[in-house]
């Protein structure tokens, strides 16, 4: 394609990824790619490869596949289904607002890959690229890894597009407002719980000490949401879920908190996951299934999950407002 034929603007939405199917073989392929990323597991490569291929990928795929089967729908992976709807709705929103832009979706691991999606955008003549990783709070293993994948592909291009990479939106007013509105809607429908738990994806505590701002960004998101909801310190809690391995991760842990709350007199809990832009295994199974059971088994009476922002109108409007300054 000639240079004169270029001049198109592209928006790339990027999320973590999902197996192609809820089977052990598909999950194994996905986990092998995910857990081979040095941004995700920061231990000496040779040692980790021995552990990964000698132990983890022998045991974990079948167990994870069974969990994926619980949340899989006729539309497939919940994360993929929601992400495709987000992409289509953002495209419609930007078009309605007068922007000529092509919106694409890529997954950091699995399909559609970052490389294949960028190549498709390149074929379309896109020479202005706006990347929005759908991780509200920057973290090196997520947002940082997304940038790595984009840079790896672009390093092979002769003609580079202008690039705008949105690295965090943890305190963006539209994001906070969308979260607050979703929580208020839940409170209006089901009543205000004794405690609102804001559960974020965890990470090794070591990452914090190495300078990763994720923990601080999670704290700020929580503070802004609690302030706008008018919650006292006793009415909300911040926790971290999905820990993996034996290292110390960010605390307090979500599962330990769910087990302890009933003994503290908290019998009615609502939980929201502000680090997840779309519902997925970690919310639909780990939170709704595992942690809901932990809470009720410990004596809790009412447990409910407030869905991720997914493709609701406030969320799509927020995405549009994030990318518009760069179009």
Swiss-Prot record:
Keywords: Cytoplasm, Heme biosynthesis, Iron, Lyase, Metal-binding, Porphyrin biosynthesis. Fe cation binds at residues 201, 282. It is found in: Cytoplasm. It comes from the Bacteria. HAMAP family: Ferrochelatase (MF_00323). Belongs to the ferrochelatase family. This is Ferrochelatase 2.
